């Protein structure tokens, strides 16, 4: 089985993508997986560090607040579409998976036009622009939250939850020990409520 996984820009897209790749490799040992991302973005470092090959496209996001910065946008998009078509032809995937971020647009569009099975994985309760644009063309849309029919065609939605890293799933067997260690590390006690706050758009 040959799989292309595309998307990125932030850790919120990249790490679920790597988790998907790892899950595929666990189930299909001989699966060939190719990542496609955006040149100069985080995925160009994180994906090879995880042991996977990645090809970068010159694609860039549309600047909605700084319109004057969009002069090169159509040229980069056209170049990315041409390169995406070449990648699809050369790699010949059985399925193409998009995880969000503008890098996934060209490769998913190309796969749809060539009748290759496609799906997108939406990690958020409010989908990104690229996934909303791609929704009508892809075969399936994997979501982590209910009521996503507000944004996507109901007949394409599959509730899967969010992919998690293998090292996180392995924590379950040592949860009691880890909990004790965490309480000690952060000087916390169980007689008071504990609130964890995370935020940011770069994988926090």
PLM regions: where:
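Cofactor-binding loop segments of dinucleotide-utilizing enzymes, especially the Rossmann-like FAD-
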Residues: 8, 38-40, 59, 123, ...
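Short amphipathic alpha-helix
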Residues: 13-25
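Conserved nucleotide-sugar phosphate-binding/catalytic loop shared by glycosyltransferases and other
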Residues: 3-10, 26, 30-76, 81
